[in-house]
Structure formats: C-alpha cells, structure tokens
Amino acid sequence: MKVLTTCDDTGAAKLCSFKRGTDTSKKDATQPDLIENCMNLPKSNYKTRIIHLINYNYQYFIASRLGGTLSIYDYEENDVAMKPQEKQEGNGSKSDKEQKSSLKVESESTNSKENIEEVAGYVEERFKFLHEFKLPVSMNDRPIALQKCEKLDSVLVAYESGKVYLVYVGDFSFEPLLLHLPGCTHLNAFAIHPEQENVVAFGGKETDLQIAELYNSSVNSKIFKKDYKSAFVPKILFKAKNVSNDHLNLRVPIWITNILFFTNNVTNGQYKLITSTRYGQLRIYDTKHGRKPVKDYPVSTTPILTLLFGNDKETEVVLTDTQNLMAKYSLDIIDDKAFKTNSASAGDIIKPVPKLLGKYTGGNTGATLAQQVYEGIVAFAGLDRYLRVFDVESRQILAKVYLGVEVSSLIIIDDEDEENEEEQKRKRDEEEEDNEMWSQLDKKQKV
C-alpha cells in the first residue's frame, strides 16, 4: 500500500509504503517499507502547512496551504536515493526521524529557479514541485475545501471567509478568479456535485445549507481562451431552512461541518444531500420535499469532523469526531428509540438514530482529521500521529503506522501490497519462459 499524508508540524508531506499487517507499535510485527518526507518548500512550517491534498486525475498532487498558497506537484514519483541510516527501521519507537531533502524548485510560468536549503538527505524530491499559485487571502483565512472540476481542468478552493477561488491548472500563468457566493460570510463546509460540477453546496457557522450554480453546464475548459470572467456568476438554487425549535422552544444553532451529495436515485433537477454538524447531528435534505431537512439524527455528543460514504450505494457513512470515534452508520436501518433523554418540562425525549454498524478500533486516542474511503479500504489519521488502515466492510485493521506528525489530509495512492523482489523475479522468469515457448511454437508452425 502507498499513502501520502500531510505533516502539520513541518508543513511538508510524508509518503508511506507498507504491507497489510504492518504495525509499528509491535516490534515483532511487519514494519513499513518506506516512510519518507516530501513536498518540502522554502520556509515550510506549521503556519504554511498543507490543509488539503488531492490527486488531480493522476497528473498532479495539489495542496492548499495556510496563507493562500496552492502548490502543484507532479504525480509521477522520482527515484530518490536515501541514506541508509535515514530509512525508518520501524521498531515501534515514537522518535520519528525527520529526514532531509535537497530540492530544486522551478516555476514553469516564470522559468525562475531557486535552490532550497538542505533540510534532510535525499538527492532530489520524490514529487517534483511544478508551480505555486498565490491566492489573495489573509494569513488567518483557513482553506476549508479543495475540490476538482475536471470539465474545466480546474480546482475550487474555498475559505472560511466565504471566498471561493477558481484556479485553472491547465495554464500556470492563470490568475485565480474570485467567485462571489451571494450572502455568504462564513464557511466551514463546501462540496461540489460529483456529476454536475457547476453545482456546489456550502454552509458553516450560522450559514445554513445552500446550493448554488457557479456557471452554465455547457461551459468547459475552452472558456479560458476567451473572456471567461463573465461566465462565472454564481446564483443560488436552494436555501435550507433551520429545523424547528427544540423542546424548550429555543432556536437550534447552525454549524455545518461536512456536506455530501447523493447521486443514486435522485430525480433530475432535484438534489439530495447529507450534512454533519458541530453539534453531532446528521441531517438529510431532499429539495423536492421542502427546505427543512427530511431527517435529523443525533449521532454524537461531540463535533463531527469528517464524513464520507462507506459504500457505492450511498446507504452507509463513515464519520469521525473530535474525540476518538471512527465509526460506520447505516442510513437505511434506523433505530427509532436509540436516542433517549429526559427534560423536566417535556418529559422523555426519544429520537431515531441511524444504526451503528460498528466502530473502527485500533487504539485511537485523539481527533481524527483526515480519512479516505478507497476500493474497499478506509484510512484514518489525525492528532495522535498514527495512520490506520481498515477494511471498510469487516472493520478489520489492516495496517497501523506511526508517522511522528499530526495529519490534516491524506491520499491513498495504492491499495495493493507491493510484491517483494523474489516474487517479481519469479513472475519475470515465468513471463520469459512463456514468451520463449510461444516463440518456438510460432517457428514450428512456419516450418
């Protein structure tokens, strides 16, 4: 397996290569094949750390950093010569050695070259740095989403302030375009529709769910060869309405943390979404059934940090919170009386809750900030500095790797175990034997 994670402490990233069964907390268990620092930039540190990291169509890795920086890296790996003593031995110790690298940065738009001081010990960086876009935001304005628009060959970067920038990565000389979301002043969640890239949903602290069309669906990347700015005028398609007052007749506060679009069994022109909140709720919206959520489930007493679908049918979700919860819930199977509380004025209060299908347990001791579901596996990482990989369905732990750094984002690059050299040699020999046999048969047929 290969997983790329961010390094909050250093502002860089780490590439981890390991097999199923790896566990750095046990000396006699399988250890990682590789843990290597990468994506170092000049003056990289905690204040310029990577918040979001995405795989852009197996062409680039794109990272949104604090301070308004969007960094572009080549997806292809360079062969990197490691000093033997710097390769992690994986003995389960928490003294994670910081590795050094020497990197020559080249900006393709200006052809300027800059030597970066040596901060670790490689001949070159694992992923070549290609370009850096600067977005005009304040240092305190945190990026809350990085989404790709394949049809436009672009990405969208959303910030807490409500600013959303469109960046065309097909031309590194492109000037990022600011998109003005009507009436939006604070964001904590931003999502693009997987099948309608011109449609987005957003929300945040006291910003209830809204759906907007950013541009006409007929627009594609050719627009950037023209006067394109007039083509991007966001308009609101849907505004959600808050749930009814609580049992004390008090207004329920709004604080959306994640948004997902449903794509299965949704009528054209209508939208169905699920959101999580800072107050531990899951809410499902269906625009054909009005502005209020059609379902409102309390699932946690602490803020929900991440939310992803757990299967292709979109009937399960995997979520994490600020404590140590990493769990899978069913959206089809509902426990009607799972949530019970008592109020002096209203008596017993009973609410339905999605069925807890199970927790992912592996000794997690802190908030999980990053997760990805990919090809039947799910990876988690966060404040306790461990990367954990599980089978989504069985929830069996497949690998546990100590990284030595806090993680905000991760990408599963490869879910398969790398074959060892002996296995690779055996396969090469078998292929050569097969080729030789077929070659001899061809010669006999010709005779």
Curated annotation (Swiss-Prot):
One of its GO terms (cellular component) is preribosome, large subunit precursor. Residues 83-114, 414-447 are annotated as: Disordered. Residues 84-107 have a biased composition (Basic and acidic residues). Signal peptide: none annotated. InterPro entries: WD40/YVTN_repeat-like_dom_sf, WD40_repeat_dom_sf, WDR74/Nsa1. Keywords: Nucleus, Ribosome biogenesis, rRNA processing. GO terms for biological process: ribosomal large subunit biogenesis; rRNA processing. It is found in: Nucleus, Nucleolus. Transmembrane segments: none annotated. Component of the pre-66S ribosomal particle. Belongs to the NSA1 family. This is Ribosome biogenesis protein NSA1. It comes from Lodderomyces elongisporus (strain ATCC 11503 / CBS 2605 / JCM 1781 / NBRC 1676 / NRRL YB-4239) (Yeast).
